UniProtKB/Swiss-Prot annotation:
It comes from the Bacteria. Gene3D superfamilies: 3.40.1280.10, tRNA(m1g37)methyltransferase, domain 2. The lineage of its organism: Bacteria, Pseudomonadati, Pseudomonadota, Gammaproteobacteria, Enterobacterales. S-adenosyl-L-methionine binds at G113, I133, G134, D135, Y136, V137, L138. It catalyses: guanosine(37) in tRNA + S-adenosyl-L-methionine = N(1)-methylguanosine(37) in tRNA + S-adenosyl-L-homocysteine + H(+). InterPro entries: Alpha/beta_knot_MTases, tRNA_m1G_MeTrfase_C_sf, tRNA_m1G_MeTrfase_TrmD, tRNA_m1G_MTases_N, tRNA_MeTrfase_TRMD/TRM10. It is found in: Cytoplasm. This is tRNA (guanine-N(1)-)-methyltransferase. Its EC number is 2.1.1.228.
Length: 255
């Protein structure tokens, strides 16, 4: 996968290119990241990249000409088929389904805004899609872009150590992940669930699915509203609810 970055602070993306899963992907040639700074496309000695908004008001906007020239340079480098994305609070909210959708693109260009944003006409003429990582404001689009790159790169074949890892992540099936345990078997009196030590893969799968359903019901119940549960999933969720109620009753009785 090839990703182009339009940013006033391209050095921030070393966190992606030099470390962790994405760093290994870059090193192994599975992910290629190039960056363009609008500042390199300015024509004044101050390398100005911001301008006042029409109508007044606080703050500045990114200057149109350097930004457009940077986007055009990235498009030229990408060739045909690159999707241009603007990271924006007004965009579609990124979720696992969206990540999976974006991962089908072999070429992405991510435009990172700064100041109060970018000219609406640049969005209309240069941007294919707007994406947001949440209903809050950040100082720029770099962190959302890094979030998008990290999440999308997990779908690139060969990036993860285990091919099933991406499909077993939280939200991959619309559910939160189940609890995980490693050594020691007992930690401050808390034991690993016996089923995970049993070696019975069918029971382990069943336990993990039940816990995933139950955790989603407890913490993010609205996610379940969007799912059509299978007969097995509905049965396991009902079991979890019964067990949870029994545990709560037992806890209340001890209080």
């Amino acid at each position: 996968m090839w990703i182009g970055i339009i940013s006033l602070f391209p050095e921030m993306f070393r966190a992606i290119t030099d470390y962790g899963v994405t760093g290994r992907a870059v090193k192994n040639g599975l992910l290629s990241i190039q960056s363009w700074s609008p500042r390199d496309f300015t024509h004044d000695r101050h390398r100005t990249v911001d301008d006042r908004p029409y109508g007044g008001g606080p703050g500045m906007l990114m200057m149109v000409q350097p930004l457009r020239d940077a986007i055009h340079a990235a498009k030229a480098a990408a060739g045909e088929g690159a999707k241009v994305i603007y990271l924006s609070p007004q965009g579609r909210k990124l979720d696992q389904a969206g990540v999976s959708e974006l991962a089908t693109n072999q070429k992405l260009i991510l435009v990172c805004g700064r100041y109060e944003g970018i000219d609406e006409r640049v969005i209309q003429t240069e941007i294919d899609e707007e994406w947001s990582i949440g209903d809050y404001v950040l100082s720029g689009g770099e962190l959302p872009a890094m979030t998008l790159i990290d999440s999308v790169s997990r779908f690139i074949p060969g990036v993860l150590g285990h091919e099933a890892s991406a499909t077993e992540d939280s939200f991959a099936e619309g559910l939160l992940d189940c609890p995980h345990y490693t050594r020691p078997e007992v930690l401050e009196g808390m034991e690993v669930p016996p089923v995970l030590l049993s070696g019975n893969h069918a029971e382990i799968r069943r336990w993990r699915l039940k816990q995933s359903l139950g955790r989603t019901w407890l913490r993010r119940p609205k996610l379940l509203e969007n799912l059509a549960l299978t007969e097995e999933q509905a049965r396991l969720l009902a079991e979890f609810k019964t067990e949870h109620a029994q545990q709560q009753h037992k806890h209340d009785g001890m209080a």
